[in-house]
Amino acid sequence: MLFKRYINCPLCFERIKISDIGFKCENPGCKGKPAFFRPPNSISPLEKMGLKSAPKRYPHECGNFATARICPKCQQEIPTDVDELSDMSIAIIGAKESGKSHYVAMLIHWIRRMGMEFGWNLTAMNEVTIDRYDQEFWRPLFVKHESIRSTNLVRGAGQAAPLIYSLCIGRGLLSRRIMLVFFDAAGENLEDASNLWYINRYICNASGIICLLDPLQLSRVREVLASKYGESSLPEINKDTGLIINRVENLIRRHGNARGNRIDIPLAVAFSKMDFVRDAGENAAGVYDELFRETRHHGAFCEAEFKNIDGLMRAWVQEVDVSASILAQSENFEKNAFFGFSALGCNPKGNGERLDRDPRSFRVEDPFLWLLRQKGLIKAMKG
């Protein structure tokens, strides 16, 4: 039996040798140095070749066994069974006001809720993930009925930690466990040299990218909605919307992760706030009606529904994107698809802060299910 020899750290996204993973003593009475690494001569050749599993605990100088594991690169504590899971990191990128935090909140809520139907179980892999999701995502939306504050710019070690989950798909001998890592980054970070060192590794090593775009930034959509609701009801104009896919592409190419002319990381282009744009464009009503009907993704990925929505969204984008850049840029990714969703299902009141009720999302799951299908992790049905 062969064991994994390398993993991508779910916190700093560096590629690390499993045999180099360190340990941390959690004994409160320990007087030695808590974090330590195994002496090189204690690592057997069989382990280095992947013919023997790495230990899950190691004796510390204080006499206790250390079980907490730490990354040799960033020195942060990583999940204990990180080397036993297939890793799937999903980069969620979006321009300002595209609704990244609301999307992450409702996607995780949906994954949990659909466990029985899809035969999976989602488990947070560390306390940071449990606390972050509860305090920064769940409570604002479902307890306080407030919108979530915007994603902070990445500032080195000050950046909020990724949300790390174990997703067990299937049951018994045929079950498969994957490590899901969600990291939401602001699109403006991709142009800030001081931030790129952290984001680069994450995006370039991602298993899939969900690029969130705000349709209210498209000029033709704005014209219709401004005449109907007034300019003050719309978010501030942000030119990043038409550039973000191009920025992601350039970042990946700069770091040599593109094979050939097209990038092989699957790209899901997802437009948020689609409940707000029904009258914006000749194709908008058809898109709206399809998006807000009952989903056909019941326990599997429905190919027919995906193709229908993807085609409708492409036609709508072609109509409302005057620059014609979004469709063109997406073609630089070998696998790309278009989606529309609403994370909240309503428009926050009172300066965009208050919700009248619990959020009722529509279609937040579609990009995620498509990415799982690209990796062969869920079944597909034709209709």
Language model: regions and residue ranges:
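Switch II of P-loop NTPase G domains
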Residues: 157-209, 216-224
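Conserved glycine(s) of the Walker
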Residues: 98-100
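P-loop (Walker A) phosphate-binding loop of NTP-binding proteins
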Residues: 95
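Flexible phosphate/Mg2+-sensing switch loops adjacent to catalytic phosphate-binding sites
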Residues: 82-83, 111-152
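Hydrophobic anchor at the beta1->P-loop junction of P-loop NTPases
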Residues: 90-92
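A conserved segment at the C-terminal end of the G1
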Residues: 103-113
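Long, basic/Gly/Ser/Thr-rich N-terminal segments
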Residues: 1-85
